[in-house]
């Protein structure tokens, strides 16, 4: 049994069920008992709490998404960083990933592909206008809602384009099938890397 299910985080978020397992965090469906809203809580796994780089990425995600307000980007409601537990409270998305949709349906027809792409590009335009480069655009990080709209998620390796972080990383960051050549080489990236990934 998962140690968070059935527990309240900070007396406010009642964790109901595990809904996703990511590279560094697990995502739970929960209830905000202060207002009854269903939320998603992304909790950094215990084995990564002492990993400075992953903790920095996790905090970076909350900062990046908190700056954004767009219908095609998942919203952040609350964050908590402590010695005990680190989590991000986000909008709960009742849907599937674009990857799951494509695996189920097969090849998308051109109208559907254009419809999804326009929504992704609108989300990225908003992020770029706010100085944020996602750097990990892939079907697994795009949620498809029942009404056909999409939400871009997982800003865990996002970079603030205006933050002065214009140095080479010497390591590739992103998902190998979708990253731009400059990302693959560990070079500095900008918003064009996101467009390449789309």
Task: Report the location of each language-model feature.
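Protein kinase glycine-rich loop
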Residues: 15-22, 27
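Activation-segment/catalytic-loop signature of the eukaryotic protein kinase fold
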Residues: 79
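Conserved short submotifs of the Hanks-type protein kinase catalytic core
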Residues: 83-97, 101
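Activation segment signature within eukaryotic-like protein kinase domains
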Residues: 116-117
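AlphaC helix of the eukaryotic protein kinase fold
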Residues: 45-67
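Conserved N-lobe loop of protein kinases adjacent to the ATP-binding glycine-rich P-loop
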Residues: 31-38
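Protein kinase catalytic-loop region centered on the HRD/HxD motif
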Residues: 120-132
């Amino acid at each position: 049994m998962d140690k968070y299910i059935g527990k309240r985080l900070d007396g406010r978020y009642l964790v109901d069920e595990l809904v996703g397992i990511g590279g560094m965090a697990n995502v739970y469906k929960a209830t905000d008992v202060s207002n009854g809203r269903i939320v998603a809580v992304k909790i950094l796994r215990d084995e990564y709490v002492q990993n400075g780089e992953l903790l920095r990425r996790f905090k970076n995600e909350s900062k990046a998404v908190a700056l954004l307000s767009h219908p095609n980007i998942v919203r952040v409601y609350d964050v908590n960083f402590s010695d005990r537990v680190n989590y991000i409270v986000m909008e709960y998305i009742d849907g599937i990933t674009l990857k799951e949709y494509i695996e189920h349906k097969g090849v998308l027809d051109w109208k559907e592909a254009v419809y999804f792409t326009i929504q992704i590009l609108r989300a990225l335009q908003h992020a770029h206008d706010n100085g944020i480069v996602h750097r990990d655009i892939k079907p697994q990080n795009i949620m498809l809602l029942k009404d056909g709209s999409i939400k871009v998620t997982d800003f865990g390796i996002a970079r603030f384009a205006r933050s002065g972080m214009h140095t080479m990383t010497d390591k590739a960051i992103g998902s190998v099938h979708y990253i731009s050549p400059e990302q693959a080489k560990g070079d500095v990236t900008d918003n064009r890397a996101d467009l390449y990934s789309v």
